[in-house]
Amino acid sequence: MPDALVGLDVGTSGVKGVAIDADGRVLATATADYPLSRPQPGWSEQEPEDWWRAAEDCLARLPEGPVGFSGQMHGLVVLGADGSVLRPAILWNDQRTAVEAAEIEERVGLARLIELTGNRALTGFTAPKLLWLRRHEPGLYAQIRHILLPKDYVRYRLTGELAIDAADASGTVLFDVRRRVWSEEVCAALDIPLEWLPESHESTEIAGAGDQAAAALGVGIARPGPVSVVLGTSGVVFAALPAYTHDPQARLHVFCHAVPNTWHAMGVMLSAAGSAAWLRGVLGAGLAELDAEAEGWEPGTEGLLFAPYLAGERTPHPDPDARGAFTGLSARHDRGALWRAMLEGVAFGLRDSLELLRELGARPESGRISGGGARSELWLRIVASVLGLPLELTESEEGSAFGAALLAGVRAGVFADADDAVARCVRTRRRIEPEWDYDAGYARFRKLYPALSAVASP
């Protein structure tokens, strides 16, 4: 049995690595950062070589052992015939592909696309990026022979294998999510060669998953039960499903889970902790200071509301042009009020996703919360109250990397399956109960997007 199981998460800001033992105890961690490029408004790119160098750096500082991978979803890496990268990767938060997303829905048919893939063709997804390259960089497009997603490029550099897991492939809009295979029908409609696509496997076979599936596994969600709530740069509410189902309006994402024969639905808001980072910079203060000032305000901050659409939105409003706003400002409001309203606004956005998951049949009685935003004690209390769910924190705070390490253990035979890995390695350390009634505030929040959309569009 290996002494260590290693998980690597190829994130938007850097690679995070963790090594654990067979009981889930953290032996070592490592991080390595890299830059994000925004060459034009709405664009978001990174150099795949930066991911590889960061992964090498982390692996050099971790004990040796089987390696599992997680990473940012939807990003497009294009390789030529010799396996070299042809251009910077286009990331999940890139918004340049509105025309191509609409083209996909027209060519496949929106209802058919949702039936096959469980999702609409959103601007951040992978397939619209390919069509954008075909339209805007035809010379480069003609050189493409392989496509990969971010974490799978790192695996390729480490092993030479061109492969992907069903969980991450689900976010390409090229994957038949019910059947857990590439969709020949969608690829034919879009004129995308099937031979460009990496071979797909179950996450437990290849020790890899998209970041949200890996993060959910890392907090113990292998089967239906608690929801996973992630307060990362983006915000996620995630529920495991025992069978494939989908929202005909595709207001939620439905993907394959990292557990075989299990699916998940999730709502994604594009600016959760991202909203906090932005406002902290504007206000010029630290987290503890702002939380303390916000504690002086009652829930609802005397009518101040924040619309958390700083980077467009996905759930429940698939709108890349959505923009954020504060409404209800008065001369009484200070920076503590702004901070609390922002925390509440993000929590309201998470509740949008929870309500849709309930419509799809999820019946959670609690949640597991993770992500950088969970460092704010006040935010934990607000999110629990807005969602109306007790929230639990797990002992491990390593998120997707921890889930990737569990997958490495399953692949290596340390654990019998994902359920065994969760039972042996995931433990909760704290429970936060709801304490405030936010139903009236949420009802007001739901009116914000329709009211703002007309004036907020560029």
Features from the language model and the residues they span:
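Gly/Ser/Thr-rich active-site cleft segment
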Residues: 10-12, 114-212, 276, 311, ...
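Short glycine/proline- and acidic residue-enriched helix-loop micro-motifs
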Residues: 110-120, 432-435
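N-terminal phosphate-binding loop and adjacent alpha-helix
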Residues: 29-63
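Glycine/Thr-rich phosphate-binding loops that ligate phosphate moieties of nucleotide
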Residues: 1-31, 68-107, 239-252, 256-458
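Active-site nucleophile and cofactor-binding loops and adjacent substrate-binding regions
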Residues: 24, 46, 68-71, 90-93, ...
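Short beta-strand segments
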Residues: 9, 68-71, 148-151, 220, ...
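ATP-dependent carbohydrate kinase catalytic cores
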Residues: 167-265, 271-274, 288-293, 300, ...
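Phosphate/pyrophosphate-binding loops at sites that engage ATP/ADP/AMP, CoA/4′-phosphopantetheine
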Residues: 55-66, 137-141, 184-194, 353-365
